A protein has these predicted regions:
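Sec-dependent bacterial lipoprotein signal peptides
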Residues: 1-16
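Residue-level marker of intrinsically disordered, low-complexity segments enriched
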Residues: 1-3, 108, 231
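Amphipathic, positively biased hydrophobic alpha-helical segments used for protein targeting
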Residues: 9-11, 95-97, 306
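Exported/periplasmic ABC-transporter solute-binding proteins
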Residues: 18-58, 62-65, 69-70, 74-77, ...
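Pocket-flanking alpha-helical
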Residues: 70-101, 216
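Periplasmic N-terminal soluble interaction domains immediately after the signal peptide in Gram-negative
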Residues: 102-106
Length: 312
């Protein structure tokens, strides 16, 4: 409880500092101070977009709260924020809740990314098909030797970022299907902590957002890729190197990488203020170029892929 209170005090202090930056500035499409909520799996993309937006519009200050997708959307439903970056649109029930209060929010698709699976560099297993993944996540397969005899990595330790994260929801909805997620899965806290855990644990299988490892320009991304292996995933019954794919931008574009998902801005801004301006930036040409350079698939720009590397 004390940690949670301290976190919110820090957010309020940050908001106060930003207000100092824009003291006396009226909120418009491109000025003022707002707090937004961001699914933590999308924080690298959000951070770069917000930094460029604030540099372009120096009378605007965006205070991001990086949290689980469930908490981010709950903040929007409670009218605590007017802008959320998430990996799903609003549901019919959520829309009905807004409409009953005379609010008419939007779900704006701005990109496609995916779920990346990472394993320890000492692990010989880095190719999976969807059927094997379903058995791993549901607890039917619990040891690496059941996937590859003689693998020697022991027990499979599946690790997510947060119990309420979008990655957990994706695995439950899109991989497990009607099967329950195994209680053997556990949460590390954040995507960075998932990467750290996998880097030091030979038997770990980590589940993270692709944008944590997709930006070749980012030295932190390159450091992460030196610490772990990014798994290949296949739709085929028998996964081979030739029919399995890593989450490259090109394979997100063609759909050959199976674990894709869309990124949405959830906007409830009846006054058409700064949240609407931020949305127009993300979905406009400059914001979409940032998506492209981050190694993700933009929603509204053509993709010109000229080269595909052999390894992430």
């Amino acid at each position: 409880m004390n940690i949670r209170i301290g976190f919110w005090l820090l957010c309020l202090m940050s908001l106060g500092a930003c207000k100092g930056k824009t003291s006396g500035v009226q909120e418009t499409l491109f000025s003022g101070v707002i707090r937004v909520a961001v699914d933590e799996t999308l924080s690298p993309l959000a951070e770069e977009e917000i930094n460029v937006f604030e540099a372009q519009y120096n009378q605007a200050a965006i205070v991001p709260l990086y949290t689980s997708e469930v908490e981010a959307i709950n903040l929007l439903l409670r009218d605590s924020v007017r802008w959320v970056l998430a990996t799903r649109p609003l549901t019919e029930n959520e829309l009905e809740s807004f409409h009953s209060r005379k609010f008419f929010p939007e779900s704006v698709k701005i990109a496609t990314d995916g779920i990346a699976l990472i394993v320890n560099r000492q692990n010989a297993d880095s190719i999976f098909n969807l059927n094997t993944l379903q058995k791993v996540f549901s607890g039917e397969i619990t040891r690496w030797e059941e996937i590859t005899p003689g693998a020697g990595a022991g027990e499979i330790q599946v690790v997510f970022d947060h119990p309420n994260s979008s990655t957990v929801r994706y695995v439950i909805d899109s991989i497990c299907g009607e099967k329950r997620l195994s209680e053997r899965c556990h949460a590390a806290g954040t995507n960075r902590e998932v990467i750290d855990y996998v880097a030091r644990t030979r038997g770990a299988l980590g589940v993270i957002g692709v944008n944590w490892i997709s930006d070749a320009r980012d030295s932190l991304c390159r450091d992460f890729l030196e610490e772990v292996q990014v798994a290949r995933v296949s739709r085929a019954d028998r996964a081979t190197y030739g029919n399995s794919y890593q989450p490259y931008q090109y394979y997100l574009y063609t759909g050959q990488y199976p674990l894709c998902r869309d990124i949405y801005i959830l906007l409830n801004d009846p006054r058409s203020g700064l949240p609407s301006g931020l949305t127009s930036f993300f979905s406009g040409s400059r914001g979409q170029r940032i998506v492209l350079k981050a190694g993700l698939l933009p929603a509204t720009m053509p993709v010109n892929i000229v080269n595909v590397r052999d390894q992430i």
